Amino acid sequence: MNDALLVSQPGIFSWNRIDDGSALLVAHLPDDLGKHVADFGCGWGYLSLVMLLGSPGIARLDLIDAEYRALEAARANVTDKRATFHWLDLASEPAPATYDTVVCNPPFHTGRAAAPALGQAVIEAAARALKPGGRLYLVANRGLPYEPVLKAHFASFETLADNNKFRVSRAIR
């Protein structure tokens, strides 16, 4: 993947680079994500690009973001015919389908203000959108209060990676 050819712009999360959390998440994604997969809070599409390249069994990948400019950047970057794009706010609107796997680097800011409840709402949306036995792969800053939400909405979860800044988790519905 050539970063110089990707479309983004100031104001979109990690607009000019691949963020460290997403890079850590990608290093822990399996090759088989299932047939129906979603990228919740897709941003400019980095995680989706990696999933489509690394998991050939994906039949459909839904890219979902509440930020219109981010979704349009993802649309420009992710041209694979398996990708579909949805402009919606997962904190208040249901996902468009059910999934085998949801991958997420959830937002936790509104503007410049910290809003961990936003990330918690996205995790709850993932739980509602996953098929029984479906998997959530999640990266988040270590200090965010997401474990209680994972415990409340998933049958199990485990930490796949943990460094001084980020934690990658897999949760099973």
Language-model segments: which ranges?
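Class I SAM-dependent transferase core
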Residues: M1-D31
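Conserved SAM/SAH cofactor-binding pocket of Class I
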Residues: D19-C104
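Short glycine-dipeptide loop
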Residues: G57, L130-R135
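Short beta->alpha hinge that forms the Motif I/post-I loop of the SAM-binding pocket
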Residues: D65-R69, L118, N141-R142
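A short SAM/SAH-binding and catalytic strip from SAM-dependent methyltransferases
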Residues: T101-A113
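A short glycine-rich, Lys/Arg-flanked "PGG" loop and its adjoining helix->strand segment in the class I
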Residues: G119-P132
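Conserved class I S-adenosyl-L-methionine
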Residues: N141-F154
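Core SAM-dependent methyltransferase catalytic element
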Residues: A155, D162-R173
